[in-house]
Structure formats: structure tokens, C-alpha cells
Amino acid sequence: MPTTHFDLTLDICAEDGTRTRYYQQDEHIGGKTLRQLVSPRLFNQPLLTLASEHSVSAIPSRTIDVILAHTASPPPLTLPPQWLDVAEVNGESFLEAAGPDESPEARDQTASVVEIHTRGGWMVLLRVELAIQATFREERQFLAHFSDLPVIPFRLLAGGIGLINPPNIGRVTVTPPLKGVSETALQADLLSCSRP
């Protein structure tokens, strides 16, 4: 009889650019931890507290940019209304999905690649699939209320889940451009972004 091995690695990516790693190999405790992580109110508590038989760590929630929970057994995600799926991608996988001759706009009108940069310098590239937007106003709402979300959950490319703390987002770039937004925005192409 084959045995399955459970492990959970948590990377806490902070606004000061540090990454702190935690590990859990007990399946029962790890499952409980994952269920607590997918709470939409995760970042509303003042401290994120992690404990083991060896130590207790408390991290101010406001200083956390991203949490990455690497595991082969991720829990289902609670997504914001109108969001159908959110998954980490690499840049080439989305652009090559339908072949070189199709434009991103022709591939899937409900999916966008969203590049999120946080205050701590962390970057996540996500494929966000939304319910079909009926009006330009609804498209504008997607971007306008991005930072109002309590948490942005997503599936990790290598297995597991990720959670972004929206108040710590420094920039969001959406491809293809949302028509309802691009027609009213300042007209300029993104060339580069660098840290001092």
C-alpha cells in the first residue's frame, strides 16, 4: 500500500522585501492551517500568528504583501463575486495558449493576465477569468475596486495557493486592456519599472 506524504511550506513575503518560510508536515495540522488561510478576512486581523511546538511567530498583517502556501493538496478558494478562476501563470503560457496568430483579445474575452507588483517588490502574474462583463462600467469596477478586496486568492502554478494583501499593491497591469478603462485613462505605454 503506497503512503502519501503531506507537506506544507508557507512563504510570507513582506513589504520590506523579506521572505520568511514556515513548514508543516502533519496532515491534520496542515489541513487546518490551509482552511484558516483561505478565510476572506485573513488580513483583517492585526497579527498573523504561526505556532509550533518550538516557537510562536507574530507578524503584523499590514506588513504582509503575499502568502504562498506550497502543497500538493490545496483547498478550494473563495473567490470574489464575478471571478471564476485565478491562477498563477508564466508570461509565455498565456500568450502561447491559442497560437501565435491570435491576438490576446480574440482568445478569451473573459480572461486577462494581471501583473501585480507589491510595495515589497514582489511580483505575481495571474490569469484571471471573470464572468462576462456586460458594460464598460462593470469593466471599470474590476480595476477600481481591486484594492478594496479583503484578499486576492489564487492557485499556484507549482501547486498550492497564494494570497495577496490588496492594500500593499503598488501597481496592477491588465492585459489585454479593459476597454472601459483604457478609453478614459491617460494614454501611455508602460516602458519600465525600477526600484531605487
Specify the residue positions occupied by each region the protein language model found:
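Detector for Asparagine
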Residues: 44, 90, 165-168
